[in-house]
Amino acid sequence: MEYFIVPYLLWFLYVVFMVLYLGIKDQEEGNKLIAFLIIGMTVFLVISAIFPNGLRLRPTTFARDNIFVDMVKKLYSVDTSTNVLPSIHVYNSLGVMIAVARTKLLKNHKIMKNGLLLLGGSIICSTVLLKQHSMLDVMVAFILGALAYVVCYREELATRTSLSSAEIE
């Protein structure tokens, strides 16, 4: 499981790269991604201020000794397991995955698109497998993501709903 440190650490580049890429190449989608991220991180800060939280899931001993275990140990030493609900790694990864799925820039680049979606899924899995977050942290991030999706993409949802209603009639 220690190998999941790689996608976990790639999260930083994943989010920054996609914000910059979409901000330059697809401003409409980039702005929606930024709004999505701002909503989630603001809610996270409010929750953490009102309801400080934490976990005690991390192991104290490891079955193997390799560079990836060393990286996990270093992560544990610099990143406390406090204020983990909801998981910002999960929430921001969801936001990037939504933007990747929606942008027209990747329409003809299936390998890149699927690779970015796979990386996002791996990042989400890594949060639990590295014992950085519980399933509750992940579920709350998904719920928050669904709510933020409605806020950030409501125009498309309204258009899609009205089109579906027109097709029924």
Show the residue positions of the predicted features.
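Membrane-embedded alpha-helical segments of multi-pass membrane proteins
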Residues: P7-Y14, I88-G95, M139-I143
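Aromatic-anchored segments of alpha-helical transmembrane domains
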Residues: M41-A49, L118-V128
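Short hydrophobic alpha-helices at membrane interfaces in multi-pass membrane enzymes
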Residues: N108-G121
